């Protein structure tokens, strides 16, 4: 992923000033503080536990910065947003457009993963391709996949699953399959 902290802040509509980090490049985005490596941007999601509880751990593990819905101390680089998940999704949509990769989407009641894998394997004979890993096919997994694709990707095959009414619409709006 080739994005600077300043560019990310601009895309997601950060509520704080990050101009001091204009040239600071982010390696990748992680929502699991245990998987953070040096130069990553941490994404604190709310689930069974609030990911904000793990911001300090993420910094200790090498995070360069974090998204946050709460003010942090001035010595920590952060992007203040109203909703971290929404910011993550907005960033993924921007990144897919910026890279101009061809997006292929697979959805349905049964056979999504097998179909996605087959399409990927066929395209990989001619193009540099990337695909949804496992079944990361929801409102978190799809943006995660998009933001983790290699920089030289020409075709990305995204699996889209639905748990709630409107999920496919959301994912299609983010990915804009062609």
For each feature predicted by the language model, list its residue ranges:
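Phosphate-binding loop of NTP-binding sites
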Residues: 10-12, 88-178
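N-terminal leader/targeting and accessory segments in enzymes
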Residues: 1-90
